């Protein structure tokens, strides 16, 4: 999803992720009317099916890198031994093993974003919503993340990304441009 600032891109992601309510219309998630779900059902969907990569990271300052990555697995009820293995895999994948015991304030912005991405994908969601996932990364890291997202998509995860970067948008299969809350164009890549 692309468009100028204020076009409604992040709002659309929040509606798709069931964090915000639409003003009108219907939205179905896994054949369920998302616009009519109660908070308990929305929470269940978040835990089991949706991963979020936020532009502003939303890491928990009082938790280490490893604990931040582990948090969604605790909510999903994953056993401790399995959680540790899954966190270790993410730390290794993102070259952050040496930083596992650091707190977010001790990391650069790019490193914080990598932790946010690892946290979003550690539970292997069916839908990954990414709001400017490469916004605070240098270009090589950005390309690495885009290749990873592409691989996850090939493995069956649906990914909806908001970006201002044309090159990174082309990693997707479809580009939707939004202006003033309306779809301006919808192109297959």
Where are these regions (language model features)?
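Short amphipathic beta-strand/extended segments with alternating polar/hydrophobic composition
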Residues: 36, 188-189
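H-loop (His-switch) and adjacent beta-strand-loop-beta switch element
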Residues: 175-188
């Amino acid at each position: 999803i692309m468009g100028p600032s204020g076009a409604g891109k992040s709002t659309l992601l929040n509606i798709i992720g069931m964090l915000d309510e639409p003003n009108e219309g219907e939205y179905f998630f896994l054949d369920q009317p998302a616009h009519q779900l109660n908070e308990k059902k929305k929470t269940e969907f978040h835990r089991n099916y949706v991963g979020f990569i936020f532009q502003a990271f939303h890491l928990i300052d009082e938790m280490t890198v490893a604990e931040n990555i582990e948090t969604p697995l605790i909510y999903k009820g994953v056993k401790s031994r399995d959680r540790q293995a899954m966190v270790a895999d993410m730390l290794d994948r993102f070259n952050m093993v040496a930083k596992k015991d650091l707190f977010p304030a001790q990391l650069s912005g790019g490193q914080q974003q990598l932790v946010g991405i690892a946290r979003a994908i550690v539970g292997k969601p069916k839908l990954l919503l990414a709001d400017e996932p490469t916004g605070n990364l240098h270009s090589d890291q950005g390309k690495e993340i885009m290749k990873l997202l592409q691989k996850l998509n090939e493995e069956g995860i649906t990914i909806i990304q908001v970006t201002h970067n044309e090159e990174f948008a082309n990693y997707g299969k479809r580009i939707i441009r939004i202006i003033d809350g309306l779809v301006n164009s919808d192109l297959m890549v």
